[in-house]
């Protein structure tokens, strides 16, 4: 067999504890080191704006799931899977009811998940947690138009920007701003 990524289902909020427990199984030789190679909690960076302050936080984008890179043996796969399933907080492997060998995630899907988590090369810029709707009233908190209010005309989420119609001298003027420069009213 070759190394493949599998998805381990856990109780939500127990991901870090389960990750440590799986690493301990390998460290204490309950599972051979040539079977489990890596384990990841799929997280992404988000920029939150709270009380006018920006901060970058880590958020799980698949709560209750871990990615485990394994080379499951053809013969003794049940032993390995049962050891992992015995960990408190583990529900089981995705694609396996317990009697069948777990299904590996396709290489493309694993690459996309790891890329989104920033584990492999790709866009690692923090995503903005705040979203706006067209027509929503906002206040500009940063930049030359700070303290002005306006109405959202367009949301460009892929560029983390928003176009706001600001009334200056009695005329609505469109202004393109970063998402972190505005807050909802």
From Swiss-Prot:
CDD domains: KOW_NusG, NGN_Bact_1
NCBIfam families with a match to the protein in the record: nusG
Sequence ranges assigned to domain KOW in this UniProt record: 134-163
Origin species: Treponema pallidum (strain Nichols)
Disulfide bond found in the keyword field: no
GO BP terms in the entry: DNA-templated transcription termination; regulation of DNA-templated transcription elongation; transcription antitermination; transcription elongation-coupled chromatin remodeling
GO CC list: cytosol
Membership in a protein family: Belongs to the NusG family.
Swiss-Prot/TrEMBL keywords: Transcription, Transcription antitermination, Transcription regulation, Transcription termination
Gene that encodes it: nusG
Job description of the protein: Participates in transcription elongation, termination and antitermination.
Top-rank taxon, per record: Bacteria
UniProt-recorded name of the protein: Transcription termination/antitermination protein NusG
């Amino acid at each position: 067999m070759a190394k493949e990524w599998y998805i381990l289902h856990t109780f939500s909020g127990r991901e870090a504890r389960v990750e440590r427990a799986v690493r301990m199984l390998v460290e204490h030789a309950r599972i051979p080191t040539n079977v489990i190679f890596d384990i990841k909690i799929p997280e992404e960076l988000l920029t939150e704006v709270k009380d006018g302050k920006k901060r970058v936080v880590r958020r799980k984008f698949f709560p209750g799931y871990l990615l485990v890179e394994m080379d499951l043996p053809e013969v003794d796969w049940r032993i390995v899977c049962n050891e992992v399933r015995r960990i408190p907080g583990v529900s089981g492997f995705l694609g396996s009811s317990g009697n069948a060998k777990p299904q590996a995630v396709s290489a493309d899907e694993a690459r996309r998940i790891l890329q989104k988590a920033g584990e492999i090369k790709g866009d690692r810029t923090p995503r903005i947690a705040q979203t706006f709707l067209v027509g929503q009233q906002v206040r500009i908190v940063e930049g030359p138009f700070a303290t002005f209010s306006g109405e959202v005309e367009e949301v460009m989420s892929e560029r983390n920007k928003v176009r706001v119609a600001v009334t200056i001298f009695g005329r609505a003027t469109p202004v393109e701003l970063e998402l972190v420069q505005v807050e909802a009213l």
